Amino acid sequence: MVLGIGMSRRRWALSASVALVAILVAGGAQAQSLSDSVRMTVQTNPKIVSQENNRSEVDSELRRARSLYLPQVDMRASLGPEYTENIFTPPGSNGQHIRQELSAVLTQKLYDGGATTAEVDHQLGRARSAAYRVAENAQYVGLDAVEAHLDVVRLRDVLALADKNVQAHADLVQRVQARSNGGAGTAASLNQALARYEAAQAERDQVRGDLADAEARYLTIVGQAPGTLEDPGVPAGQLPTDLDASIHIMRTNNPVVKAREADIDTAKAAVELADSRFDPKINLEVGGDHNHNVGGVPGRDNEARALVVLQWNLYAGGSDIHNREAAYAQVEQARTERLEALRKSEQDLRQAWAAYEAAEHRVPLLTSAAQHDSEVRTAYSDQYQLSQRSLLDLLDSQNDFFQAEINAENAKSQAVFQAYKILAIQGTLLQALNVPPPPQADPSTPTPRPIRPEGT
């Protein structure tokens, strides 16, 4: 068993040497910053790209609605045999002719009760809502990237601590073996040390598994495997002075709330569209016909016209009334959803602030506790050598020190994450990281016309 420990120590030393060489080789390469991780996520994450495509689709609907202001031109042509027998059929004719028709009509809306304007406003509201949903996904998927980045950094640090913990237990096994060989130790003490050593190895394996999961999640969110990652600190300069200031920023910038406000405008436009159904429709029609052999009459039959046409539905079974009632209900629903989104965002923001302040308070305490545990471990090691402390005391002090280091590391990472979560809920995460939002997140900027997909 002692030989096995010695081999383990040599393997650990070899691994440490390889890791050191890798660090030195990679030293010239710049660590990937948190901003880089979020920027790649915003550019490539499928959730965000899906919302960008939705914005493009809605913008196409907006262009379609605006085209309703323009005139419509229709042409019709026909050619074929016709048999006609009526009072206009010339004597001696068999009533068979080759009928030819050609007509063209230009129709321009003069009045439609505001239906076209309401449809444009409806699609404008949808476009604004779609833009804010792009911004929403960019903020919160960006926050997922922050969490994935921090988790990889944290677990790599924890793995380094676990390696040190395994080595410390290996050293203890060697010391107990040496005492046992000198007649000062027992087989029970050696077994106790070996059990703790193996438990430390198992804990390190667990950390390795957690790190592999974190790296896989990073790959899924960011779109590439994590290399050397920068360990970011708390963005203290980007945070508001207090919770009230943060809530004020959230009410102004949170994209979830702004999307719901756009939904209210969309629903109001639907009410105007429903109201327009009660008004007449007035169109200007300019057209002409160039025909031959129509209605059994041989020869030309030409016609030109310019008409003002009024069309008014006087009764539709009450469907227009029901449409208007449904539109009013949609407005109230949109207002309720906006209030719900605002309350939920404020709740999330308050919880994030509480978690951030708690983590910030815990970091110095846990760091100090780890330092004290380190001093206790050193003192117990000296006392154990003088037989003034038991092996159990020494093993427990090593475990306490290891757990204290992990607790301090976790608290530091949690404080950083909660700070960025505050920024995301405010709607200012990308701005704080100097990451440009997707162009589709700007409601004032129309998206370009989509390219025809391949295979269509």
Question: Where are the regions a protein language model picked out?
Answer:
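Transmembrane beta-barrel architecture of outer-membrane proteins
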Residues: R99-E101, E147, Q192, K281, ...
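Periplasmic alpha-helical coiled-coil/stalk elements that build and connect Gram-negative outer-membrane
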Residues: V2-S8, A138-R251, D263, A352-A355, ...
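Acidic, low-complexity, intrinsically disordered peripheral segments
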Residues: G4, Y83, N407-T456
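Small/polar (Gly/Ser/Thr/Ala-rich) solvent-exposed segments
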Residues: V49, Q72-Q96, T107-A138, K258, ...
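Amphipathic alpha-helical coiled-coil segments
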Residues: S50-A65, N137, V141-L161, D171, ...
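Amphipathic alpha-helical coiled-coil scaffold segments and their short linker/junction regions
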Residues: V38-V42, L190, L194, Q224-G287, ...
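Boundary at the C-terminal end of the N-terminal hydrophobic targeting segment
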Residues: A29-S33
